[in-house]
Regions:
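N-terminal pre-domain/capping segments
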Residues: 1-104
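Active-site groove signature of glycoside hydrolases
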Residues: 97-117
């Protein structure tokens, strides 16, 4: 069995997280927040640092996860300001996934509206 962890569930300090992963035999890293930024908000040099740390420590990235579309509602439409903001974030996360070798990008579902009959 191969085990991994959502890294910021341990700490947003990725180096510390990798130490804990080694201690408990966790192989795969799912990234959501690293430092003070959500994936997709890191600049190119920060992404290189993240990638280098994980590769040097033998921790493949299993998934990048961002709260894309969380908070949108049925009132939001493709092309509106909020939808465009989320789509731009998704593009940045996909670019980061290519760099760190992540096979998956996980997004969230829109806000569920209560339906009353």
């Amino acid at each position: 069995m191969k085990l991994g962890v959502i890294c910021d569930g341990i700490s947003r300090d990725l180096s510390h997280t990798v130490d804990v992963m080694d201690e408990f035999g966790l192989e795969y890293a799912e990234l959501q927040f690293v430092g003070e930024k959500e994936v997709g908000d890191h600049d190119a040099s920060e992404i290189r640092e993240i990638d280098l740390l994980l590769r040097d420590r033998g921790k493949p990235v299993s998934c990048l996860s961002r709260h894309i579309f969380a908070g949108t509602t049925i009132a939001n439409r493709p092309g509106d300001e909020l939808h465009t903001k989320h789509m731009d974030a998704l593009k940045r996360v996909i670019e980061m996934a290519h760099i760190v070798g992540s096979p998956l990008v996980r997004i969230m579902t829109p806000k569920k509206e209560q339906i009353l009959f």
